Regions:
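Basic/aromatic DNA-contact patch characteristic of tyrosine site-specific recombinases
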Residues: 1-19, 23-30, 34, 40-43, ...
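N-terminal DNA-binding module of tyrosine recombinases/phage integrases
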Residues: 1-72, 261-278, 357, 372-385
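N-terminal core-binding DNA-recognition domain of tyrosine site-specific recombinases/integrases
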Residues: 17-117, 135, 289-295, 310-316
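Basic, Lys/Arg- and aromatic-enriched nucleic-acid-binding interface segment
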Residues: 83-87, 91-97, 101-103, 116, ...
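C-terminal catalytic core of tyrosine-transesterase DNA break-rejoin enzymes
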Residues: 116, 163, 167, 174, ...
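Conserved tyrosine-mediated DNA breakage-rejoining catalytic core shared by Y-recombinases
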Residues: 129-130, 145, 178-266
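Catalytic-site neighborhood detector that most strongly recognizes the C-terminal catalytic loop/helix
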Residues: 132-134, 140, 197-201, 340-366, ...
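Short, polar N-cap/turn motifs at the start of nucleic acid-interacting alpha helices
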Residues: 182-192, 311, 330-353
Length: 412
């Protein structure tokens, strides 16, 4: 016989009744976050909790938190100084609306869980108002600018990284995490790469927490080359989603650049001898060590300034690549999705299909040529058009009499 369910203890009920938002968020991360979030998302959410939520409303009792409290909190954040991450330049900027939007999303998710756990009856974040803002569009190069960048860049590392981002529609972590065992240059006319990992720097605390839950996607941890202990670790990890694992066909120009990089690495190995550590990385220092995202970003920024090109960030190259492929393929979203690794085709069109001024101008010109030119031109005699059609159709009917039967059948 099933034993009776024990009612919750009085102590537990009292604890639930007087739990603060800060205490609840700690529990939320442990019971929910560590079972659902990846390392980067876990790190970002912990940062938002510690720096943007707890200092302001962490002491509020969970049961007392209202929608009005959250509206006041979000407006207060607009006037607070933004938190400066370690290694970043100090600025006088206040918390941006985009950060507040992310904080709100985190609180809404957490408070939904509070409802599920019966801490509260309703979610006060459901009807809270966040400051409105229009996200700025990410600047991308035109085809002419991108072509100039490839031609002008004489840094083999940066050029190869740009070619992979543009030719393969890769994210920066996928570019830096690409290894030679995933590169196939056996057919120079059709080089291929396989994306099954990415390079990323993670907080050791977050990584260890996920390891204890057997949820770490890390394939390899690089050693710490600093002379002092570090709270972070550079890793090669599996992509966030299964759809990000993919095979990509590259243009021969990209394959040729990769072959040149491989040859240069072999020379570096010979020169460095034991000083070269071979991690198998395509984008690597002369000692074999990996490049990090900020190092490539610095290279790109310096090159853009020197070349006089419009300023863009490295991720803009992926945007440019996706847009260009959509245009070249006449909107073959599935083919482009295969390169970008998006889980859903809609994400390609919603996030990356930026219609440039050139394509919009071309569209207007095509409308003039294909539609308006005919609609405003003098009308031709119908009989002339019909005669021309019959002249074109006659040889086809002579070669294939079955078409005559089909035409007769459609007239009935």
């Amino acid at each position: 016989m099933r034993p009776p369910v024990k009612p919750p203890s009085k102590e537990k009920f009292i604890a639930k009744k007087f739990i603060t938002l800060s205490e609840f968020l700690d529990e939320y991360v442990q019971l929910y976050g560590l079972n659902h979030w990846g390392a980067s998302y876990l790190s970002n959410n912990r940062h938002r909790i510690e720096h943007y939520i707890k200092p302001y409303i962490g002491s509020v009792l969970l049961r007392d938190l209202t929608t009005h409290d959250l509206d006041i909190f979000y407006n207060q954040l607009l006037e607070e100084p933004a938190v400066i991450l370690k290694g970043h330049k100090r600025t006088d900027r206040t918390v941006s609306p985009s950060v507040i939007e992310k904080v709100h999303g985190l609180l809404r998710s957490a408070l939904n869980q509070a409802v599920a756990w019966e801490y509260i009856a309703r979610n006060p974040a459901q009807y809270a108002s966040i400051p409105e803002y229009t996200p700025g569009e990410r600047a991308i190069w035109s085809e002419e600018d991108a072509a100039s960048a490839i031609q002008l860049c004489d840094d083999p590392i940066l050029r190869s990284a740009m070619l992979l981002a543009i030719g393969g529609s890769l994210r920066i972590g996928e570019v830096l995490g690409l290894t030679w065992d995933c590169v196939d240059l056996s057919d120079p006319a059709q080089p291929q790469i396989k994306i099954d990992k990415e390079l990323e720097r993670l907080k050791k605390e977050d990584l260890e927490d996920l390891k204890r839950r057997d949820r770490s996607k890390v394939k390899f941890e690089f050693p710490n080359w600093k002379k002092t202990p570090s709270t972070t670790v550079l890793v090669l990890k599996a992509p966030k989603t299964e759809s990000s694992k993919r095979r990509i066909y590259l243009a021969p120009t990209v394959g040729k650049a990769l072959a040149d990089v491989k040859a240069a690495q072999e020379q570096a190995k010979a020169l460095c001898g034991d000083g070269y550590t071979d991690y198998g990385l395509v984008i690597a220092h002369d000692t074999g060590r990996p490049y990090e995202e900020r190092q490539i970003a610095e290279k790109l920024k310096a090159f853009i300034q020197e070349a006089g090109l419009p300023p863009v960030v490295f991720h803009s190259l992926r945007h440019f690549s996706t847009t260009l492929k959509l245009q070249i393929s006449n909107g073959d979203i599935k083919a482009v999705q295969g390169d970008t690794g998006h889980a859903q085709a809609r994400m390609v069109t919603d996030r990356y299909a930026h219609i440039t001024d050139e394509s919009r101008q071309h569209l207007a010109q095509q409308m003039e040529k294909d539609f308006f030119h005919r609609s405003t031109a003098p009308a031709s005699p119908v009989s002339t058009s019909q005669d021309a059609d019959m002249q074109a159709l006659l040889p086809l009917l002579q070669k294939n009499p079955d078409i005559v039967k089909l035409l007769i059948a459609t007239m009935k």
